[in-house]
Amino acid sequence: MGLAEHITRVWDDEIVDQLRTYITIPNISPAYEDRWEELGHMERAVALVRDWCAGRQIAGMTIEVQRLAGRTPLIVIDIPAFGDTASGNAADRTVLLYGHLDKQPEMTGWREGLGPWTPVIEE
């Protein structure tokens, strides 16, 4: 199987359903939803992402959810660098990715049968 076929298979078999589930979680940013902790949507989103990532077979990967009172959780995923580098130090291959799990408030104007928390794939 070539790289493009592998990516398509992983996308279709492992990612699309997770995205659909994520879309259904009305996890509004705490900047717009004072009751975000009480509602529990952030916890559902964190669990979804944490569990999906934990299911990947990546050597040496560790996953930790860090929490501070009154703040949104932080998922820290550490994957050690490996392989040769020009300096011989794998630590030179550090990459940092950052993202967030909260969403902006929903807007109006959706077509019939569509909405911000309803995943739809249109061909």
Q: Where do the language-model regions lie?
A:
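A non-catalytic alpha/beta surface segment that caps or lines the substrate-entry region
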Residues: 32-92, 115-119
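Active-site metal-coordination/substrate-binding segment of hydrolases
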Residues: 85-123
